[in-house]
Amino acid sequence: RDTDRSRGLGDVYKRQRIDRIDVSEDAEHVYVKVIDYKSGNKKFDLAALYYGLQLQLVVYMNAAMELESRKHPDKEIVPAALLYYHIDDPTIETPVELTDEQINEQILAKLRTNGVVNSDPEVVDRLDHYLQDKSAVIPVEKKKDGSFSARSGILSREEMQLVSAYVDAKIRDIGREILDGKIAANPYEKGNEEACTYCAYKKVCGFDGSIPGYEKRQLEDLDKQTLMQRMQETMEA
C-alpha cells in the first residue's frame, strides 16, 4: 500500500512516497510495518542512522504512523518493523541435487527482509506466525531458550520510539541548516567506507583531501548500546 505525505518545518517540507505499508489491528492497537524496496542489497545500519546518513526508512515510519493515528485516533499506533526488501530473482547453485522444498527454502533465505523489528512478542508473532527458530521473512532468530539471538535485528518498543524521535529531530536540524545556507561538502570516513567512493557529484564538488584544510569527518563504529545512549543524551540536551 502506497501513501504520499508532506510534513512541514517552517518553510521546509519533506515529501516522500512510501513503497509499502502493512498494518495489523486489534481492539486497542494498530501495528505498522514499513517496507522499502531496493534494487541493491541495502542493510539497516543504526550507526549510519545516528550520524544522519540513513534516515529515510524511519522518516517513512514516522509519516506512516502519523497517517494511521489520524485514521484511528482511538487506538495506540505501534511501530512493528522497518524493513528493506531486495528486489531480486535469486538462483541457487549447489553441487548436490536438492528437493523442491530445499530449493524454495534457500530462495526464501536470499529474499528475507533486512532491518529492525519490534521485539514485543505480540508484534513478532503478527509478523511471522510460524516462527520457531529462524524466520524466513523477517530478520529474527530465536535461541533454544526462546530469547532472540545476537543476529536478530530487533529493538524494544522504547528503543523504536527513541529512534523515531531522534530522526525527527535530526531532520529538523538538517532543515534549519539548509535554511541557514549551510551546504558545504562535508564527507565522512567510517572504517573502510567513505562518502566519496560512490558519490555522483565528486567530480564537481571540489573537495580535495590533498589540500590543507580539507578533511573528512571520522565517524566512530559504535555498538548498539552506545548508540542508543547517545541518542537519549541528544534528546535530553
Predicted regions and their residues:
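Short, non-ligating residues that shape and space the ligands of small metal-coordination modules
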Residues: 205-208
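Conserved catalytic cores of phosphodiester-cleaving nucleases, focusing on short active-site segments
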Residues: 14-26, 31-43, 60, 199
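Short alpha-helix boundary/capping segments
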Residues: 45-55
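Single conserved hydrophobic/aromatic residue that forms the stacking wall/gate
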Residues: 2-13
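Metal-dependent nuclease catalytic regions and adjoining charged, substrate-binding loops involved
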Residues: 63-198, 213-215, 219-237
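Cys/His-rich metal-chelating microdomains
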Residues: 202
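Short small-residue beta-strand/loop micro-motif enriched in glycine and branched aliphatics
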Residues: 41-46, 150
